[in-house]
Amino acid sequence: MAGGRSTPRTGSAGIRWASTGRFWWIWAWWAAAVRWYRPWRASGGRSTSLSRSWRRPGSARPCAGRWGGAGQQPLRIRDYGAGKGYLTFALHDHLTHQLGLQVETVGVERRADLVALCNRLAQKNGMAGLRFEKGDILRAGDAPQGLQEGQEGLQGLREDVHVIIALHACDTATDDALWQGIRQQAAMLVCSPCCHRELRPQLQAPAPLTALLRHGIHLGLEAEMLTDGLRALLLETQGYEAQVFEFISPDDTGKNRMILGCRTGRARPAAEARAEIDALKAFYGIRHQRLDALLQASDGLSPS
């Protein structure tokens, strides 16, 4: 850093992280965790130090003081659909032990056995500030009326949240995680989607693309691109700067797409963004998209 400004960096797929450490440190952490955390987790946390897994030990330091209230209040992180906690453990360890930050991390997972397993591991390894809770992404009473699905409520998650993460939240669970982040006005949303099943059955090949989309593989790729493109546009309507990119080599995982949103509080003009979203949906014959429906049912969530 020079003169109080971070140096622009170039990340995966040539992405240039201009003007802020708030973006690129998340990319560095996520890529490293996917590659090198699994051996530690497979060992039950006994034989391998998380700190030895990090190939970019100082990558996050320039952004450590960028959070409001840094040093006065903890950085609050929610991992929705935490599963076995691969990234939850890695991120919490990196921020607390590598960067010395005060962090409160909660992994949210529906399966009680995984919640119990991860809590045992966290306690066994003395990871203060990290816990896992059983529940659904959309909690009863929080989802807009008509879109609740019998979700199990969570305890103690009403406070401000700074970072929302979701790794491979299946299909519309990614939309639910993004909506929760928007609702909680999280500073950063980091989601790696998978499955993309919602739009594919609705997708109608427009006349110019019929010859291309008659192939199943092309139709699937088009549905993925459309799904994540709409999600990014919707984030922009809520005051987020949004990017969609590959964050890690496909040799590590084929599910290597990331949606990254950083809250700026400056939303795109509503009419302009709505026109783009509606035009895309009409072009492909899309009748319903989960995040769009959540936002409309809650009358949008205006940025502040």
Residue spans of the language-model regions?
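Conserved SAM-binding motif I beta-strand of class I
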Residues: E104-E109
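Conserved S-adenosyl-L-methionine
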Residues: R78-G81
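A generic structural motif
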Residues: G100-V103, A128
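Conserved SAM-binding loop of SAM-dependent methyltransferases across substrates and taxa
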Residues: K84-G100
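Phosphate-coordination loops involved in phosphoryl transfer and adenosine-cofactor binding
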Residues: Q72-P74, Q102, V161
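Class I S-adenosyl-L-methionine
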Residues: G3-G4, R9, A33, R41, ...
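Alpha-helix termini
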Residues: G58-G71, L95-G100, L147-G156
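Conserved Class I S-adenosyl-L-methionine-dependent methyltransferase catalytic core
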Residues: M1-L75
